[in-house]
Amino acid sequence: MAVTMADITKLRKMTGAGMMDCKNALTDAEGDFDKAMKIIREKGQAVAAKRSDREASEGCVLVKVEEGFGAIIALKCETDFVAQNADFVKLTQDILDAAVANKCKTLEEVLALPMGDATVAQAVTDRTGITGEKMELDGYMVLEGATIAAYNHMNRNGLCTMVAFNKKVDEQLAKQVAMQVAAMNPIAVDEDGVSEEVKQKEIEVAVEKTKVEQVQKAVEAALKKANINPAHVDSEDHMESNMAKGWITAEDVAKAKEIIATVSAEKAANMPEQMIQNIAKGRLAKFLKEVCLLNQEDIMDAKKTVREVLKEADPELKVVDFKRFTLRAE
């Protein structure tokens, strides 16, 4: 039977596939819409299989809050061109709407949700067949709370955050905290949310860094005392190039190497342990100030911390939790 433009348009609305794909599917299915949809779906599965090893680094990230339940989801693809496509954004929004309406707690639950005559997982595969790009759902996060603030950074669908509070909060203040999470990327609400493993690792790194700095200071002081510029002998390459320039002599280099070896060994063997630990603890405190939301300088008023801003608004107001997802490596 002849395929009409009306039939092609109808199938396109049903599947989102291109006009030529719809025409070919209807032709192969001899006008049977169910068979045509199956053909398009099978094409999507075939394309998805071929694209499975490709990297999907672009996409659309959206956030939604409804009746004390919030969720972030990302539908990823290969190119920004597809990510900006209205149908792609709509599919992401439709999936998020369904996830929030059903209060899904996991990505697996989202993928199993019904969508049209299939599932969310199948809808994503179908879209792969239409665009020819690998697609996958990622970054599904949920929050529940008395009040949840949501923020889509600059409405560009690339970075979204949610913040849950223990009670009703001023809308502008809530958005400000959600923006803080987007801008400053904290890893925990406060120190209690940072694992002991992370704290211990930071202490170990700080101790080693401090020891290296103490040795370096001692070496530089000894070199200066010997009338040798530390910058001229801080590496083998510098020693050679600076000798070639006539800035130092071979005797200077030999003397510098002896000083570096001797002073480094002596300083390492006589390191003031208590001082090292104190400096390391100070560096841990600085780290916790930078990565804990409540300890951070407020993005709207650097003279105050987020904790102070919240306390001024309401002494009983607390941040319960937050979520953040971005497509970009940071």
From Swiss-Prot:
Keywords: Cytoplasm, Elongation factor, Protein biosynthesis. It is found in: Cytoplasm. Residues 79-82 are annotated as: Involved in Mg(2+) ion dislocation from EF-Tu. It holds the Pfam family EF_TS. The keyword Protein biosynthesis applies. GO terms for cellular component: cytoplasm. SUPFAM superfamilies: Elongation factor Ts (EF-Ts), dimerisation domain (SSF54713), UBA-like (SSF46934). One of its GO terms (molecular function) is translation elongation factor activity. InterPro entries: EF-Ts_dimer_sf, Transl_elong_EFTs/EF1B, Transl_elong_EFTs/EF1B_dimer, Transl_elong_Ts_CS, UBA-like_sf. Belongs to the EF-Ts family. Associates with the EF-Tu.GDP complex and induces the exchange of GDP to GTP. It remains bound to the aminoacyl-tRNA.EF-Tu.GTP complex up to the GTP hydrolysis stage on the ribosome. This is Elongation factor Ts. It comes from Bacteroides fragilis (strain ATCC 25285 / DSM 2151 / CCUG 4856 / JCM 11019 / LMG 10263 / NCTC 9343 / Onslow / VPI 2553 / EN-2).
